[in-house]
Amino acid sequence: MLRDALLPAPLARSREPSFRRVERPARYLAARWTLEVLGKVVTALREGAAALREIPPEDLLAAWGDTVATFLRPSSLERRSLDPPLARLCGLSREGLKAGLEAVLGGVRREPAAALLARARPAPADAGPVLAVLASNLPALAVQPLLPTLLVRRPVLLKSPSAEPLFAPAFLAALVRREPRLANAVAAAAWPGGEEELEEPVLKGVGTVLAYGEREALDDLERRAPGKVIGYGPQTSLAVIGAEVDPREAAEGLARDIALFDQRGCLSVAAVYAAGDATALAERLGEALLDLARRWPPGPPARPALAAVQHLRLEAEMRSLWQSSLPVRSGTVIVDSNLKFRPSPGLRTVRVHPLEDLSRLPALLEPWRGRLQGAALAGDDAWRLEPRLMELGISRCAPPGELQSPDASWHNGGINPLEVLTSPSPPARRRSC
Protein backbone atom coordinates (compact mmCIF):
# COMPACT_ATOMS: atom_id res chain seq x y z
CA MET A 1 0.00 0.00 0.00
CA LEU A 2 1.18 3.53 -0.77
CA ARG A 3 2.64 5.59 2.06
CA ASP A 4 2.69 9.32 2.60
CA ALA A 5 6.33 9.29 3.70
CA LEU A 6 9.79 8.25 2.60
CA LEU A 7 12.48 8.12 5.29
CA PRO A 8 16.23 8.54 4.83
CA ALA A 9 17.98 5.16 4.73
CA PRO A 10 19.33 5.29 8.33
CA LEU A 11 15.74 5.52 9.62
CA ALA A 12 14.09 3.14 7.15
CA ARG A 13 14.04 0.19 9.59
CA SER A 14 13.07 2.27 12.59
CA ARG A 15 9.78 1.63 14.37
CA GLU A 16 9.07 5.34 14.21
CA PRO A 17 7.09 6.93 12.86
CA SER A 18 4.16 4.58 13.22
CA PHE A 19 1.60 4.48 10.41
CA ARG A 20 -2.18 4.54 10.41
CA ARG A 21 -4.50 3.42 7.64
CA VAL A 22 -6.44 6.08 5.72
CA GLU A 23 -9.44 4.94 3.67
CA ARG A 24 -10.93 8.12 2.18
CA PRO A 25 -10.74 9.84 -0.23
CA ALA A 26 -7.96 7.38 -1.06
CA ARG A 27 -6.38 4.37 0.63
CA TYR A 28 -2.84 4.78 1.95
CA LEU A 29 -0.74 4.62 5.11
CA ALA A 30 -0.18 7.92 6.91
CA ALA A 31 2.76 8.53 9.24
CA ARG A 32 2.26 9.75 12.80
CA TRP A 33 5.04 12.28 13.30
CA THR A 34 6.59 13.51 16.52
CA LEU A 35 9.05 16.35 16.85
CA GLU A 36 11.74 13.86 17.91
CA VAL A 37 11.33 11.76 14.77
CA LEU A 38 11.23 14.78 12.47
CA GLY A 39 14.38 16.02 14.15
CA LYS A 40 16.05 12.67 13.39
CA VAL A 41 14.99 12.96 9.75
CA VAL A 42 16.68 16.34 9.40
CA THR A 43 19.80 15.08 11.17
CA ALA A 44 19.99 12.07 8.85
CA LEU A 45 19.64 14.31 5.81
CA ARG A 46 22.41 16.58 7.04
CA GLU A 47 24.67 13.56 7.48
CA GLY A 48 23.78 12.37 3.98
CA ALA A 49 25.10 15.51 2.29
CA ALA A 50 28.61 14.11 1.76
CA ALA A 51 27.36 11.04 -0.11
CA LEU A 52 25.14 13.22 -2.31
CA ARG A 53 28.11 15.37 -3.30
CA GLU A 54 30.04 12.29 -4.39
CA ILE A 55 27.49 11.12 -6.97
CA PRO A 56 28.87 11.79 -10.48
CA PRO A 57 26.69 14.30 -12.38
CA GLU A 58 26.08 11.86 -15.23
CA ASP A 59 24.81 9.21 -12.79
CA LEU A 60 22.47 11.67 -11.09
CA LEU A 61 21.15 12.87 -14.44
CA ALA A 62 20.62 9.31 -15.69
CA ALA A 63 18.62 8.35 -12.60
CA TRP A 64 16.56 11.53 -12.81
CA GLY A 65 15.83 11.16 -16.51
CA ASP A 66 14.79 7.53 -16.20
CA THR A 67 12.53 8.25 -13.21
CA VAL A 68 10.77 11.11 -14.99
CA ALA A 69 10.36 9.00 -18.14
CA THR A 70 8.79 6.24 -16.05
CA PHE A 71 6.32 8.64 -14.42
CA LEU A 72 5.42 10.01 -17.84
CA ARG A 73 4.23 6.54 -18.91
CA PRO A 74 0.66 5.89 -17.68
CA SER A 75 1.27 2.17 -18.20
CA SER A 76 4.23 2.03 -15.79
CA LEU A 77 3.80 0.18 -12.50
CA GLU A 78 4.39 3.42 -10.60
CA ARG A 79 1.66 5.28 -12.45
CA ARG A 80 -0.83 2.41 -12.33
CA SER A 81 -0.63 2.30 -8.55
CA LEU A 82 -0.48 6.07 -8.09
CA ASP A 83 -2.98 7.48 -10.59
CA PRO A 84 -6.30 6.32 -9.06
CA PRO A 85 -5.66 7.70 -5.55
CA LEU A 86 -3.89 10.78 -6.92
CA ALA A 87 -6.87 11.67 -9.12
CA ARG A 88 -9.24 11.34 -6.16
CA LEU A 89 -7.01 13.37 -3.85
CA CYS A 90 -6.48 16.15 -6.40
CA GLY A 91 -10.11 16.26 -7.52
CA LEU A 92 -9.15 15.69 -11.16
CA SER A 93 -10.47 13.27 -13.73
CA ARG A 94 -8.12 10.49 -14.82
CA GLU A 95 -7.71 12.22 -18.18
CA GLY A 96 -7.17 15.60 -16.53
CA LEU A 97 -4.53 14.13 -14.23
CA LYS A 98 -2.74 12.53 -17.17
CA ALA A 99 -2.62 15.86 -19.03
CA GLY A 100 -1.41 17.67 -15.92
CA LEU A 101 1.38 15.19 -15.23
CA GLU A 102 2.51 15.42 -18.85
CA ALA A 103 2.73 19.21 -18.55
CA VAL A 104 4.67 19.23 -15.27
CA LEU A 105 6.96 16.25 -15.84
CA GLY A 106 7.59 17.14 -19.47
CA GLY A 107 9.39 20.26 -18.29
CA VAL A 108 11.90 18.32 -16.17
CA ARG A 109 12.68 15.37 -18.44
CA ARG A 110 16.32 14.53 -19.16
CA GLU A 111 17.01 17.22 -21.79
CA PRO A 112 15.90 20.30 -19.78
CA ALA A 113 17.39 18.74 -16.64
CA ALA A 114 20.74 18.41 -18.42
CA ALA A 115 20.59 22.06 -19.47
CA LEU A 116 19.96 23.09 -15.87
CA LEU A 117 22.76 20.83 -14.65
CA ALA A 118 25.18 22.56 -17.02
CA ARG A 119 24.53 25.84 -15.18
CA ALA A 120 24.51 24.40 -11.66
CA ARG A 121 27.38 24.62 -9.19
CA PRO A 122 27.55 22.91 -5.81
CA ALA A 123 26.23 24.81 -2.82
CA PRO A 124 28.59 25.47 0.09
CA ALA A 125 29.23 22.29 2.06
CA ASP A 126 27.65 23.81 5.17
CA ALA A 127 24.49 25.05 3.41
CA GLY A 128 22.37 22.42 5.14
CA PRO A 129 19.29 20.53 3.96
CA VAL A 130 16.43 22.18 2.13
CA LEU A 131 12.81 21.99 3.27
CA ALA A 132 10.35 22.28 0.36
CA VAL A 133 6.82 23.04 1.60
CA LEU A 134 4.56 22.03 -1.27
CA ALA A 135 1.17 23.41 -2.26
CA SER A 136 -1.92 21.28 -2.79
CA ASN A 137 -3.41 22.94 -5.88
CA LEU A 138 -1.46 20.93 -8.49
CA PRO A 139 -0.09 17.38 -8.63
CA ALA A 140 3.60 16.55 -9.18
CA LEU A 141 4.95 20.03 -8.45
CA ALA A 142 7.43 18.41 -6.07
CA VAL A 143 9.75 17.92 -9.05
CA GLN A 144 10.20 21.66 -9.55
CA PRO A 145 12.06 22.39 -6.28
CA LEU A 146 13.51 18.87 -6.10
CA LEU A 147 15.52 19.00 -9.33
CA PRO A 148 17.58 22.17 -8.68
CA THR A 149 18.08 21.20 -5.04
CA LEU A 150 19.67 17.89 -6.01
CA LEU A 151 21.70 19.48 -8.80
CA VAL A 152 23.38 21.85 -6.32
CA ARG A 153 23.94 18.81 -4.05
CA ARG A 154 21.77 19.71 -1.08
CA PRO A 155 19.70 17.10 0.79
CA VAL A 156 15.99 17.77 0.71
CA LEU A 157 12.87 17.10 2.77
CA LEU A 158 9.68 17.40 0.73
CA LYS A 159 6.74 18.34 2.94
CA SER A 160 3.65 17.22 1.08
CA PRO A 161 0.27 18.88 1.65
CA SER A 162 -2.16 16.80 3.67
CA ALA A 163 -4.58 17.00 0.74
CA GLU A 164 -2.13 15.22 -1.61
CA PRO A 165 0.64 13.38 0.23
CA LEU A 166 1.42 10.56 -2.21
CA PHE A 167 3.28 11.82 -5.28
CA ALA A 168 6.44 13.07 -3.53
CA PRO A 169 7.27 9.85 -1.63
CA ALA A 170 6.42 7.70 -4.67
CA PHE A 171 8.69 9.74 -6.93
CA LEU A 172 11.54 9.77 -4.41
CA ALA A 173 11.26 6.01 -3.86
CA ALA A 174 11.53 5.43 -7.61
CA LEU A 175 14.49 7.80 -7.84
CA VAL A 176 16.33 6.05 -5.00
CA ARG A 177 15.77 2.67 -6.63
CA ARG A 178 17.62 3.97 -9.68
CA GLU A 179 20.35 5.74 -7.69
CA PRO A 180 20.70 4.14 -4.22
CA ARG A 181 23.35 6.67 -3.21
CA LEU A 182 20.51 9.18 -2.86
CA ALA A 183 18.93 7.15 -0.06
CA ASN A 184 20.50 9.23 2.72
CA ALA A 185 19.80 12.58 1.08
CA VAL A 186 16.06 12.64 0.31
CA ALA A 187 12.91 12.34 2.39
CA ALA A 188 9.20 13.06 2.11
CA ALA A 189 6.66 13.64 4.85
CA ALA A 190 3.20 15.06 5.39
CA TRP A 191 1.92 16.74 8.54
CA PRO A 192 -0.55 19.56 9.26
CA GLY A 193 1.18 22.84 8.53
CA GLY A 194 1.58 25.53 11.15
CA GLU A 195 2.19 23.20 14.12
CA GLU A 196 4.98 25.21 15.72
CA GLU A 197 6.19 22.63 18.22
CA LEU A 198 6.28 19.84 15.64
CA GLU A 199 8.05 21.97 13.04
CA GLU A 200 10.57 23.60 15.38
CA PRO A 201 13.38 21.01 14.89
CA VAL A 202 12.83 21.00 11.14
CA LEU A 203 12.99 24.77 10.71
CA LYS A 204 15.99 24.93 13.02
CA GLY A 205 17.87 22.16 11.21
CA VAL A 206 17.44 23.18 7.57
CA GLY A 207 19.36 25.91 5.79
CA THR A 208 16.68 26.99 3.30
CA VAL A 209 12.90 26.77 3.15
CA LEU A 210 11.25 26.81 -0.28
CA ALA A 211 7.60 27.39 0.59
CA TYR A 212 4.53 27.33 -1.66
CA GLY A 213 1.25 28.50 -0.18
CA GLU A 214 -0.99 31.32 0.91
CA ARG A 215 0.45 34.58 2.17
CA GLU A 216 -0.56 33.94 5.77
CA ALA A 217 1.30 30.62 5.82
CA LEU A 218 4.39 32.17 4.23
CA ASP A 219 4.41 35.02 6.72
CA ASP A 220 4.15 32.53 9.58
CA LEU A 221 7.10 30.52 8.27
CA GLU A 222 9.17 33.68 7.84
CA ARG A 223 8.44 34.62 11.44
CA ARG A 224 9.63 31.23 12.68
CA ALA A 225 12.55 30.79 10.28
CA PRO A 226 13.78 34.34 9.59
CA GLY A 227 16.17 34.69 6.69
CA LYS A 228 15.62 31.13 5.45
CA VAL A 229 12.32 31.35 3.59
CA ILE A 230 11.91 31.78 -0.17
CA GLY A 231 8.15 32.15 -0.55
CA TYR A 232 6.01 31.32 -3.54
CA GLY A 233 2.57 32.77 -2.91
CA PRO A 234 -0.66 32.82 -4.94
CA GLN A 235 -0.62 34.46 -8.37
CA THR A 236 -2.64 34.40 -11.57
CA SER A 237 -2.19 34.79 -15.33
CA LEU A 238 -3.79 36.28 -18.43
CA ALA A 239 -3.68 36.27 -22.22
CA VAL A 240 -3.26 39.02 -24.82
CA ILE A 241 -4.42 38.42 -28.41
CA GLY A 242 -3.56 40.78 -31.27
CA ALA A 243 -6.07 41.89 -33.89
CA GLU A 244 -4.39 39.96 -36.70
CA VAL A 245 -4.58 36.59 -34.93
CA ASP A 246 -7.00 33.92 -36.20
CA PRO A 247 -9.55 33.46 -33.37
CA ARG A 248 -9.82 29.72 -34.00
CA GLU A 249 -6.07 29.14 -33.69
CA ALA A 250 -5.82 31.31 -30.58
CA ALA A 251 -8.83 29.65 -28.98
CA GLU A 252 -7.38 26.15 -29.14
CA GLY A 253 -4.26 27.18 -27.25
CA LEU A 254 -6.16 29.38 -24.80
CA ALA A 255 -8.52 26.54 -23.96
CA ARG A 256 -5.56 24.37 -22.96
CA ASP A 257 -4.11 27.14 -20.78
CA ILE A 258 -7.50 27.53 -19.08
CA ALA A 259 -8.55 23.89 -18.70
CA LEU A 260 -5.27 22.31 -17.65
CA PHE A 261 -5.33 21.47 -13.91
CA ASP A 262 -8.96 22.65 -13.97
CA GLN A 263 -7.64 26.24 -13.88
CA ARG A 264 -5.98 25.92 -10.45
CA GLY A 265 -2.42 26.86 -11.35
CA CYS A 266 -0.66 30.20 -11.16
CA LEU A 267 -0.13 29.92 -14.94
CA SER A 268 -3.82 29.23 -15.59
CA VAL A 269 -5.32 31.96 -17.76
CA ALA A 270 -8.00 33.93 -15.91
CA ALA A 271 -8.71 36.72 -18.42
CA VAL A 272 -8.13 37.45 -22.10
CA TYR A 273 -7.57 40.90 -23.62
CA ALA A 274 -8.40 40.91 -27.33
CA ALA A 275 -7.61 43.66 -29.84
CA GLY A 276 -9.76 42.07 -32.52
CA ASP A 277 -13.33 40.77 -32.49
CA ALA A 278 -13.74 39.72 -28.85
CA THR A 279 -17.08 38.01 -29.42
CA ALA A 280 -15.73 35.91 -32.28
CA LEU A 281 -12.80 34.87 -30.11
CA ALA A 282 -15.14 34.07 -27.21
CA GLU A 283 -17.34 31.91 -29.45
CA ARG A 284 -14.34 29.92 -30.66
CA LEU A 285 -13.02 29.65 -27.12
CA GLY A 286 -16.33 28.24 -25.91
CA GLU A 287 -16.20 25.59 -28.65
CA ALA A 288 -12.62 24.70 -27.73
CA LEU A 289 -13.46 24.42 -24.03
CA LEU A 290 -16.38 22.14 -24.83
CA ASP A 291 -14.08 19.91 -26.85
CA LEU A 292 -11.55 19.79 -24.01
CA ALA A 293 -14.32 18.99 -21.53
CA ARG A 294 -14.89 15.81 -23.53
CA ARG A 295 -11.18 14.93 -23.73
CA TRP A 296 -10.21 16.17 -20.24
CA PRO A 297 -13.41 15.89 -18.21
CA PRO A 298 -13.40 18.30 -15.26
CA GLY A 299 -13.11 16.94 -11.76
CA PRO A 300 -15.87 17.24 -9.16
CA PRO A 301 -16.57 20.96 -8.64
CA ALA A 302 -16.05 22.45 -5.20
CA ARG A 303 -19.26 24.00 -3.90
CA PRO A 304 -17.80 27.49 -3.27
CA ALA A 305 -16.38 27.64 -6.80
CA LEU A 306 -19.63 26.38 -8.30
CA ALA A 307 -21.61 29.04 -6.43
CA ALA A 308 -19.17 31.76 -7.51
CA VAL A 309 -19.40 30.77 -11.18
CA GLN A 310 -23.18 30.61 -11.10
CA HIS A 311 -23.23 34.08 -9.53
CA LEU A 312 -20.91 35.37 -12.26
CA ARG A 313 -23.16 33.91 -14.95
CA LEU A 314 -26.22 35.54 -13.40
CA GLU A 315 -24.43 38.86 -13.18
CA ALA A 316 -23.47 38.63 -16.85
CA GLU A 317 -27.07 37.89 -17.78
CA MET A 318 -28.32 40.89 -15.79
CA ARG A 319 -25.76 43.12 -17.55
CA SER A 320 -26.75 41.68 -20.97
CA LEU A 321 -23.20 40.50 -21.62
CA TRP A 322 -22.43 37.84 -24.19
CA GLN A 323 -21.72 34.53 -22.52
CA SER A 324 -21.23 30.96 -23.66
CA SER A 325 -23.98 28.38 -23.32
CA LEU A 326 -21.67 25.69 -21.96
CA PRO A 327 -22.63 23.43 -19.06
CA VAL A 328 -21.19 25.05 -15.96
CA ARG A 329 -18.66 22.26 -15.42
CA SER A 330 -17.37 22.53 -18.99
CA GLY A 331 -16.40 26.17 -18.66
CA THR A 332 -17.72 29.72 -18.83
CA VAL A 333 -16.74 32.45 -21.29
CA ILE A 334 -18.02 36.01 -20.85
CA VAL A 335 -17.30 39.06 -23.02
CA ASP A 336 -16.92 41.97 -20.61
CA SER A 337 -16.27 45.57 -21.70
CA ASN A 338 -15.19 46.41 -18.15
CA LEU A 339 -11.42 46.24 -18.62
CA LYS A 340 -10.56 45.82 -14.95
CA PHE A 341 -8.60 42.60 -14.39
CA ARG A 342 -10.29 40.21 -11.98
CA PRO A 343 -9.25 36.68 -10.98
CA SER A 344 -11.30 33.75 -12.19
CA PRO A 345 -13.54 31.92 -9.70
CA GLY A 346 -12.29 28.69 -11.30
CA LEU A 347 -14.07 25.86 -13.10
CA ARG A 348 -12.53 26.91 -16.43
CA THR A 349 -14.07 30.38 -16.30
CA VAL A 350 -12.63 33.30 -18.25
CA ARG A 351 -13.56 36.87 -19.14
CA VAL A 352 -12.70 38.18 -22.61
CA HIS A 353 -12.11 41.95 -22.60
CA PRO A 354 -12.20 43.90 -25.89
CA LEU A 355 -9.20 46.26 -25.95
CA GLU A 356 -8.41 47.73 -29.37
CA ASP A 357 -5.32 49.59 -28.15
CA LEU A 358 -3.22 46.95 -26.40
CA SER A 359 -0.65 49.53 -25.34
CA ARG A 360 -3.11 50.56 -22.61
CA LEU A 361 -2.93 47.16 -20.95
CA PRO A 362 0.12 47.62 -18.68
CA ALA A 363 -1.50 50.63 -17.03
CA LEU A 364 -4.71 48.66 -16.53
CA LEU A 365 -2.72 45.88 -14.86
CA GLU A 366 -0.72 48.18 -12.60
CA PRO A 367 -2.90 47.43 -9.52
CA TRP A 368 -1.84 43.79 -9.93
CA ARG A 369 1.89 44.48 -9.95
CA GLY A 370 3.71 41.60 -8.27
CA ARG A 371 0.65 39.33 -8.34
CA LEU A 372 0.74 38.22 -11.98
CA GLN A 373 2.70 35.18 -13.07
CA GLY A 374 2.31 34.55 -16.79
CA ALA A 375 0.93 35.88 -20.06
CA ALA A 376 -0.08 33.95 -23.17
CA LEU A 377 0.75 36.27 -26.08
CA ALA A 378 -0.35 36.01 -29.73
CA GLY A 379 0.37 38.60 -32.42
CA ASP A 380 3.08 41.20 -32.87
CA ASP A 381 1.29 43.88 -30.84
CA ALA A 382 0.87 41.46 -27.95
CA TRP A 383 4.52 40.39 -27.97
CA ARG A 384 5.66 44.02 -28.04
CA LEU A 385 4.16 44.28 -24.55
CA GLU A 386 6.50 41.62 -23.14
CA PRO A 387 9.08 44.00 -21.58
CA ARG A 388 6.39 46.09 -19.89
CA LEU A 389 4.61 42.99 -18.62
CA MET A 390 7.88 41.72 -17.17
CA GLU A 391 8.23 45.03 -15.32
CA LEU A 392 4.90 44.26 -13.63
CA GLY A 393 6.35 41.01 -12.28
CA ILE A 394 5.22 38.56 -14.96
CA SER A 395 7.86 35.84 -15.13
CA ARG A 396 6.71 33.81 -18.14
CA CYS A 397 5.40 34.78 -21.57
CA ALA A 398 4.53 32.09 -24.10
CA PRO A 399 2.23 31.45 -27.07
CA PRO A 400 -1.29 30.27 -26.23
CA GLY A 401 -1.23 26.57 -25.41
CA GLU A 402 2.34 26.65 -24.10
CA LEU A 403 1.97 28.88 -21.05
CA GLN A 404 1.38 26.02 -18.60
CA SER A 405 4.30 23.92 -19.84
CA PRO A 406 7.47 25.66 -18.61
CA ASP A 407 10.68 23.68 -18.50
CA ALA A 408 13.32 23.52 -15.79
CA SER A 409 14.92 26.78 -16.94
CA TRP A 410 11.90 28.86 -15.85
CA HIS A 411 12.52 31.33 -13.05
CA ASN A 412 9.24 30.96 -11.15
CA GLY A 413 8.27 34.43 -9.98
CA GLY A 414 11.57 35.77 -11.31
CA ILE A 415 13.52 33.67 -8.81
CA ASN A 416 16.56 31.78 -10.08
CA PRO A 417 16.43 28.51 -8.10
CA LEU A 418 20.12 27.76 -8.61
CA GLU A 419 21.01 31.17 -7.23
CA VAL A 420 18.89 31.03 -4.09
CA LEU A 421 20.02 27.49 -3.32
CA THR A 422 23.72 28.34 -3.55
CA SER A 423 23.70 31.85 -2.09
CA PRO A 424 25.15 32.16 1.45
CA SER A 425 22.06 34.16 2.43
CA PRO A 426 18.79 33.99 0.47
CA PRO A 427 17.59 37.22 -1.15
CA ALA A 428 14.49 39.01 0.01
CA ARG A 429 11.41 36.83 -0.30
CA ARG A 430 9.48 37.11 -3.53
CA ARG A 431 5.87 36.24 -4.29
CA SER A 432 5.01 33.72 -6.95
CA CYS A 433 2.92 30.62 -7.36
Q: Where are the model-predicted features located?
A:
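N-terminal Rossmann-like NAD(P)+-binding subdomain of aldehyde/semialdehyde dehydrogenases
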Residues: 1-127
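Conserved small-residue-rich beta-alpha loop and adjacent elements
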Residues: 113-179
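Donor nucleotide-activated moiety binding/catalytic core segment of transferases
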Residues: 117-137, 191-203, 335-347
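Short His-Asn-centered micro-motif
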Residues: 133-136, 159-161, 191-192, 211-214, ...
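Short, structured coil segments at secondary-structure junctions
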Residues: 152, 205, 225, 392-393
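Conserved NAD(P)+-binding/catalytic subdomain of aldehyde/semialdehyde dehydrogenases
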Residues: 179-271, 276, 404-433
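NAD(P)-dependent aldehyde/semialdehyde dehydrogenase
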Residues: 261-376, 383-384, 388-429, 433
